[in-house]
Amino acid sequence: MEKKIIFLVVLVALLALPEFISSEVIKRDIPYKKRKFPYKSECLKACAAAFTGGDESRIQEGKPGFFKCTCYYTTG
C-alpha cells in the first residue's frame, strides 16, 4: 500500500514538472504617465494590456515605480 502511495506522489510530481519548466517568467518595464507612483492594481492592468492582451491571470506581479511599472509575466 505504501509503495502505491509513493508511486502516485512521484507520478503526480512528474506530470506537474513540464508545467513549471515550460512557463518562463519575463521582466519588463513599461512607462506609466498618469500618476507619479501608480497603484499596484493600475500596474497589473497596464501590464496585462501591454503584454498579454488583457489576460491578468498570466501576470505574476506588477511593481509600481517612478512613472513606470515593472511587469513580471509568463509566456504560454
Curated annotation (Swiss-Prot):
List GO terms (cellular component aspect).
extracellular region
What's noted about post-translational modification?
Contains 2 disulfide bonds.
Any GO molecular function: toxin activity
- Give the main localization category: secreted
How far does the signal peptide extend, from start to end residue? Answer: 1-23
Compartments in which it is found = Secreted
What does UniProt note about where in the body, tissue by tissue, this protein is expressed? Expressed by the venom gland.
Q: Does the keyword Cell inner membrane apply?
A: no
Q: Which UniProt keywords apply?
A: Calcium channel impairing toxin, Disulfide bond, Ion channel impairing toxin, Secreted, Signal, Toxin, Voltage-gated calcium channel impairing toxin
Q: What is known of its domains?
A: Has the structural arrangement of an alpha-helix connected to a beta-sheet by disulfide bonds (CSalpha/beta). Since the toxin contains only 2 disulfide bonds, it is called 2ds-CSalpha/beta.
Describe the function of this protein. Answer: Voltage-gated calcium channel inhibitor (Cav) (8.6% block at 10 nM), when tested on DRG neurons.
Query: Can you tell me which family this protein belongs to?
Result: Belongs to the scoloptoxin-15 family.
What protein am I looking at? Omega-scoloptoxin(15)-Ssd3c
